[in-house]
Each structure stands twice: as structure tokens, then as C-alpha cells.
């Protein structure tokens, strides 16, 4: 098939494209390189600063449109898949629908439906916005209020979301929680794909013996700490290391270049990732592919959803239980003899559920099913 990815996030589409090319498909990625990550793309669409940057970006989009025709599958990164206002994005969406056989959506980040479900606090038991009926620290911030008012929950975004969801041929969710929200909106044209990890390029550094000290690792994204719950993970790790200084240590890095980040991560035993996720995300999965043990989201309903009953190596932490992070980190220190087994199981888990070839095949099967129903019935 001839496949076009429009937009990227955390190298998701580029990794998926690499796997699909290996299967034999012709794949093009057009994106801004996930902004600061500067990921690989075939066609660059990056928006510069100021009015001149905006004008140039619109011109680049218009100039690129003829190259975005004639594909069997167009896969969008988000309902807002370009750095444009919804009205202009809608025009490009209509163009893509008219000049290609199908248009799909990656459910892999915030959009109107997901943020609405989080903010209402009824569908999901917790999120970055709510802990049951209680607003999170981020939810109470000025940033979140501005986001709800002028961004994801605006009337303009609601209308745009409805238009896109009605117009796409299907959507593929990368996380359990995105699937859980979207199956109530588009149940008949939704699939689960997972996050693709290029395990072939990641050399495992297994924990072969019980370490004298457990080396915890946490990466801080400036400006995203409260949103991801990294602030709470960091505080708990510091308390545990202070309590067990002879048996544990903590390395904290902030805004490192990606390659240096991976290098420092590989020298650790346990990575602390996200607090408000039901599903291990890209950072945790890459660490697990290296043989690290991840402290992250991995709720029982996620494991049940993917049909995994035996290999459950992720240390799940709950934001709903007071002291849960401290307790789980203390458990790791007190049971560090289990780290070699968890290390091997972590890599095994990623190979089984998130290897980029596995995720690519899930996408391929779903696309073919939808195309067959659309054109052969």
C-alpha cells in the first residue's frame, strides 16, 4: 500500500513508517519533526516564529498539497494535524479525503473528547486533570484554566472534533485510556495499535545480578513536571533514597539531548516515568527495551485489555492511594534481588506487545479491513 503520515509525536509515526517499509509498503512522513525532537521526516512542514513564520508556513502547506494525493491510507497525528487554526485544518482535511482512498486518525494525545472525559472525571478514575472527583494540582493551575477555555474544550475545537471524527474512516489508539474514551464515540471504526518501539536498534543492558544499590533514574521535562506527575515521583524517590542511602541512589536529569538521555538512562536500574497513565508510554517502553525496570502506569485493566496474564513487570503506582509511590519504591529497594528477573521480563514485554513490527501489523490489518469494507461491498 501507499501510506502517508501527516504529523508526528515523540517519533511515533516515523518509527511506524520504518516498520511498514520493512513489510513492503511505500510510506511518506510529513511533519515538523516533533518540534524540538527533530525526528526524521520525508517532507518538512515546520512553522517559524512570528507573522513571517506563519505566512511562510501557510505557503509551505499549500505548496505541499499536490504531493499529498493518491495514497491508499492517510494517517493523521491528531484532529489538529497542522499548526493552523481549525478552520484552515478543516480545508486540508477535506482535500486529503477527496484525493486519497482513506483517512485515519492516530489517537495518541490530547484532543477535545479525551480532555473532556478527563475533566468531567466520570469515565476515567484518574487523569492528569482529576483524581476521582478531586482536581489535580495541574487542573487548578492557570495554565489548565487557559487550556480549557481557549484550547481543547473550546466550542471551536468541539465542532472541529465532531467534523473530523465523522469524516475519518477509522482511528487507531496507542494507549488503553485513549481507546477507552474513543470506543464510546466511534465504536465501529476504532482499533488498538500500541506504541511502536524499534527494539532492533535498542541494545539491552540486562540487570544480571542483584545490585548493591538500586539506581533510580528520572528525567524532568521543564514545564511538564506537574502535568505528568514527575514532581510527586521525584519527591517520593528522594524520601526513599534518604531512608535507604546504603541501598539506593537517584539520578535526576533535565532537558538533556536525546542520545545523552538514553546513555544516562542505560546506566540505571529503575526508571520513574508517569504517574497519571494507565499504560506505559514511550519513555517507559524504551527503558524497558533496554532492560530497565519501569515505575509507571500499568493498571490491571490495561493488562487485561491487551490479554497479558503472566508477564507484568511494570511497577504500577496509583495517584489515588496516599503513600503508594513511597511504598512501591521501598518495595523495590527491599526486594532488589528480583530486579534481574524483572529486567528480562521488561524487554520480553516490549517485544511481545510494542515491537514496531507488531504494532505495524496491527495497523496494516485494520487498514485493510476498513478498505475492503469501503470498496468491496
What residue ranges belong to the model's regions?
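Acceptor-binding helix/loop patch of EC 2.4 sugar-transfer enzymes
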Residues: 39-42, 105-155, 223, 299, ...
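Short hydrophobic beta-strand element within catalytic cores of glycosyltransferases
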Residues: 293-300
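A charged, aromatic-enriched C-terminal amphipathic alpha-helix characteristic of glycosyltransferases
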Residues: 336-368
Amino acid at each position: 500500500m501507499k501510506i502517508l503520515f501527516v504529523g508526528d509525536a515523540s517519533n511515533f509515526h516515523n518509527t511506524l513508517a520504518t516498520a511498514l517499509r520493512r513489510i513492503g509498503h511505500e510510506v511518506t512522513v510529513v511533519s515538523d519533526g516533533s518540534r524540538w525532537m527533530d525526528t526524521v521526516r520525508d517532507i518538512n512542514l515546520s512553522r517559524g516564529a512570528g507573522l513571517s513564520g506563519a505566512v511562510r508556513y501557510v505557503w509551505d502547506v499549500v505548496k505541499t498539497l499536490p504531493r499529498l494525493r493518491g495514497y491508499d491510507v492517510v494517517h493523521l497525528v491528531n484532529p489538529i494535524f497542522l499548526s493552523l487554526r481549525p478552520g484552515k485544518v478543516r480545508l486540508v482535511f477535506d482535500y486529503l479525503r477527496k484525493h486519497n482512498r482513506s483517512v485515519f486518525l492516530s489517537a495518541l494525545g490530547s484532543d477535545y473528547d479525551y480532555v473532556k472525559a478527563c475533566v468531567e472525571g466520570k469515565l476515567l478514575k484518574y487523569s492528569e486533570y482529576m483524581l476521582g472527583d478531586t482536581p489535580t494540582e495541574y487542573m487548578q493551575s492557570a495554565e489548565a484554566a487557559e487550556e480549557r477555555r481557549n484550547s481543547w474544550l473550546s466550542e471551536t475545537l468541539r465542532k472541529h472534533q465532531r467534523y473530523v471524527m465523522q469524516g475519518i474512516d477509522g482511528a487507531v489508539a496507542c494507549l488503553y485510556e485513549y481507546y477507552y474514551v474513543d470506543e464510546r464515540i466511534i465504536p465501529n471504526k476504532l482499533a488498538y495499535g500500541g506504541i511502536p518501539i524499534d527494539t532492533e536498534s535498542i541494545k539491552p543492558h540486562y540487570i544480571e545480578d542483584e545490585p548493591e544499590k538500586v539506581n533510580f533514574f528520572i528525567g524532568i521535562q521543564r514545564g511538564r513536571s506537574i502535568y505528568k506527575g514527575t514532581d510527586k515521583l521525584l519527591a517520593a524517590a528522594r524520601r526513599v533514597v534518604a531512608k535507604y542511602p546504603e541501598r539506593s541512589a537517584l539520578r535526576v536529569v533535565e532537558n538533556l539531548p536525546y542520545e545523552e538521555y538514553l546513555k544516562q538512562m542505560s546506566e540505571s536500574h529503575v526508571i520513574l516515568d508517569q504517574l497519571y497513565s494507565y499504560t506505559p508510554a514511550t519513555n517507559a517502553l524504551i527503558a524497558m527495551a533496554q532492560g530497565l525496570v519501569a515505575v509507571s502506569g500499568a493498571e490491571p485493566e490495561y493488562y487485561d485489555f491487551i490479554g497479558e496474564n503472566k508477564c507484568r513487570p511494570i511497577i504500577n503506582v496509583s495517584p489515588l492511594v496516599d503513600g503508594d509511590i513511597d511504598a512501591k519504591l521501598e518495595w523495590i529497594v527491599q526486594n532488589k534481588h528480583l530486579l534481574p528477573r524483572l529486567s528480562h521480563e521488561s524487554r520480553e514485554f516490549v517485544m511481545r506487545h510494542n515491537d514496531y513490527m507488531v504494532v505495524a501489523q496491527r495497523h496494516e490489518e485494520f487498514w485493510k479491513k476498513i478498505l475492503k469494507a469501503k470498496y468491496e461491498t
